[in-house]
Amino acid sequence: MLAKDFLFMKNIRITIEYDGTGYAGWQRQAGSFCTVQGEIERILSQILQEDIRLAGAGRTDKGVHARAQIATFKSRSSLGPDRMVHSMNALLPNTIRISDPLVVPEGFHARHSAKEREYRYFVREEPSAVLGRFSGCSYGSLDLMSMNRVASYVLGEHDFSVFSKETRDRTGCLCRVISCKWFRQREFFVLRISANRFLRSMVRYLAALMIDSGKGLLSPEEAREMIESGILTRQLVPAAPNGLFLWKITYGSDSHSF
């Protein structure tokens, strides 16, 4: 038995920022797909000489970015957290950065302990060769008031299954949206939305619904009916992934708040 097998098993939490453009999403996948989780696990396993498996707070889709993804993993390594992160950043591609390493209580879990997740969606009215990597485009003017009227209807608990790629039965599709609002930030229209949980691609579908209302393609009342009835009255294409960021994860005081 190796000496390190006798070392105390630590639960380590890290914050991850990434440009999701070149990745097939966050979650590890079988085959040759390059994912953010897969890249970090590969480098961590190499550094710590252990088989490392991450648990992430959010499972972002292909092309979606993160400002502050949270992940936890277990390790027996004696390597200090700060030195570990320094080594990770030296070996990871420059599209992934790790920060704020912290040893947390055994019961803390990046996903299960999360109380609230915040996403932001950035969209411009005109395409940009430079900014397009990190923003969607409406290809036309947007009415902020109409978008925020629809945003107000999103608040509260709803079955969002029609606004997702979720394959589970409808009983698992209830989400409680805590905040939802659009604001202007220079040339961007920015959606800030937070909830206790999100379904797969849910933010992108809701962003598309609100953007369509802002373009005058559907009325806020029609959008409200779709949200409340759970029935789409027209085809809805999810907003482009490049405009979406996992922005913040909030934890309760009973499980550490970061």
Curated annotation (Swiss-Prot):
Active site: 61 (nucleophile)
Superkingdom to which the source organism belongs: Bacteria
BP GO terms, sorted: tRNA pseudouridine synthesis
Gene3D superfamilies, alphabetized: Pseudouridine synthase I, catalytic domain, C-terminal subdomain (3.30.70.660), Pseudouridine synthase I, catalytic domain, N-terminal subdomain (3.30.70.580)
InterPro entries according to UniProt: PsdUridine_synth_cat_dom_sf, PsdUridine_synth_TruA, PsdUridine_synth_TruA_a/b_dom, PsdUridine_synth_TruA_C, TruA/RsuA/RluB/E/F_N
Assembly and oligomerization: Homodimer.
Protein family: Belongs to the tRNA pseudouridine synthase TruA family.
Matches recorded under NCBIfam families: hisT_truA (TIGR00071)
Name listed for the protein in its UniProt record: tRNA pseudouridine synthase A
Source organism (scientific name): Chlorobium phaeobacteroides (strain DSM 266 / SMG 266 / 2430)
Gene: truA
